[in-house]
A protein has these predicted regions:
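Buried hydrophobic positions in well-ordered alpha/beta secondary-structure cores of metabolic enzymes
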Residues: 8, 34, 61, 85, ...
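Glycine-rich loop-to-alpha-helix module at the N-terminal edge of alpha/beta enzyme cores
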Residues: 10-94
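Short beta-strands and strand-loop turn motifs
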Residues: 12-15, 158-165
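PLP-dependent aspartate aminotransferase-fold enzymes
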Residues: 58-159
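Helix C-cap/helix->beta junction micro-motif
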Residues: 184-188
Length: 217
């Protein structure tokens, strides 16, 4: 889209928004929908009250996903979504497990939790980090298995977080890596987080990138 400065200078914008929200600037269809929403005096979508519009969106998303994925939790940013996902994974076990595993080449955000599991960010991180975060080599199924076996015996693993397609590396995980991840999940009973802030909602040929892999459910 084109942007114009106050002096009238024309700037070609190749971004139009971050991650999956690359919706441009004041797109006519989005503006029309927004104006109609206000004109009809509909109750604003807000996190502190129940919203039938949010419920409808959640239902529509679950319809497009595998049948076992039926719940949505709406947040303001990718880093907040990662933080919430970490908490959900940790609390999903009656007996707490200790470790979270992440790729050494990854980016999940700059908050305390998400920054602690962002391999590409850690060397410049100037803030305290969450403990018990263990890295594995990107797209390396053997190293992944080695770390899972090791740390499962030291207190258990509650989650492995993966970018199925790394937006910073412009590189996809192999199908062999993802299949190994799911086999290990069944054996060692941990949760998987797929961070698709940059690849979700039809940025690939599927609604989410993980659906491009075989034998993933």
């Amino acid at each position: 889209s084109n942007l114009f400065t106050s002096e009238g200078k024309k700037i070609l914008d190749f971004t139009g928004g971050l991650g999956v929200l690359g919706l441009g600037h004041n797109h006519p269809k989005i503006l029309e929908t927004r104006i109609n929403f206000q004109r009809e005096k509909k109750v604003e979508v807000h996190k502190i009250i129940f919203s039938k519009y949010m419920a409808a969106l959640s239902s529509s998303i679950s319809y497009l996903l595998p049948k076992n994925l039926t719940k949505s939790f709406f947040l303001n940013s990718g880093a907040e979504a990662v933080e919430a996902a970490i908490k959900v994974c940790f609390k999903s076990f009656k007996k707490p497990k200790k470790y979270i595993l992440y790729s050494n080449k990854s980016y999940h955000g700059k908050l305390i939790g998400s920054g602690s599991i962002s391999g590409s960010y850690k060397k410049n991180n100037q803030f305290p980090e969450m403990k018990d975060c263990i890295s594995f080599n990107f797209n390396d199924p053997d190293d992944l298995e080695k770390k899972i076996v090791e740390y499962n015996s030291k207190g258990g693993i509650y989650c492995v977080i993966v970018e199925p397609y790394s937006a910073s590396l412009l590189e996809s995980c192999d199908n062999n890596f993802i299949e190994k991840l799911f086999r290990l999940k069944l054996r060692y009973e941990f949760k998987i987080i797929f961070d698709e802030v940059f690849t979700g909602f039809y940025k690939s040929k599927k609604i989410f990138y993980f659906q491009n892999f075989e034998n993933v459910s």
